[in-house]
Each structure stands twice: as structure tokens, then as C-alpha cells.
Amino acid sequence: MAGKVHRLSGEEREQLLPNLRAVGWHELDGRDAICKEFHFKDFNRAFGFMTRVALQAEKLDHHPEWFNVYDKVHITLSTHDCGGLSERDINLASFIEQIAASLS
């Protein structure tokens, strides 16, 4: 991805995070990251969700930290290039929400 990535400012956080908090994303204690656990009907839907997210993450060159247990997928987002939350995380989280909603 072209251009320097910057960590979100306090003002940017106040503007961008409330919408994600409203749908269940939360900030991690002791780390500048956001996370959420998603629940699906079964493993097949969870894996399909992960596949769709992975394809978008590859396009964005921004990859989540995640793990899957049967019908659950836990995702953590943070930008290593700036050592914390960036607009990349917000954009990927928004995309993830769209995919999750389409599979509900």
C-alpha cells in the first residue's frame, strides 16, 4: 500500500471508533488495537467468512490477527507499520462487518 501510515489521532479516534463500538468492536487493554469475536451457524460459514476477509486483506496488504474455533472467529486489528490503530484497521473492520452481515 502506497504512502506512509500514521497512527490515529485522538480526534480521528473520536470520529471513527464509535460506529465500530456500536457493533461490538472494542479496544484491547494494554495494546493499541481493536478486536471482535464473530459467531456463525457452523464451521463452513465461519471458514467462508475468513476466506472472504482474507481475499480483501490481501488486496489491501493489511492482514488481521485471528483464530478460529468451529463456529467462532476472533479478529484483532492493529497496524504494525505505525505501532497501533490506523485508518487501515478502520477500513478493514468496516469491510469485515459487511461480510459478516451478508452471512447472517
From Swiss-Prot:
Cellular component GO terms held in the UniProt record: cytoplasm; nucleus
Primary location group: cytoplasm
CDD domains attached to this UniProt entry: PCD_DCoH_subfamily_b
EC identifiers of the protein: 4.2.1.96
Origin superkingdom: Eukaryota
UniProt modified residues of type N-acetylalanine: A2
InterPro entries per record: PCD_sf, Pterin_deHydtase
Entry's Gene Ontology molecular function annotations: 4-alpha-hydroxytetrahydrobiopterin dehydratase activity
Function comment: Involved in tetrahydrobiopterin biosynthesis. Seems to both prevent the formation of 7-pterins and accelerate the formation of quinonoid-BH2. Coactivator for HNF1A-dependent transcription. Regulates the dimerization of homeodomain protein HNF1A and enhances its transcriptional activity. Also acts as a coactivator for HNF1B-dependent transcription.
Family statement: Belongs to the pterin-4-alpha-carbinolamine dehydratase family.
Protein name: Pterin-4-alpha-carbinolamine dehydratase
UniProt organism field: Xenopus laevis
Gene designation: pcbd
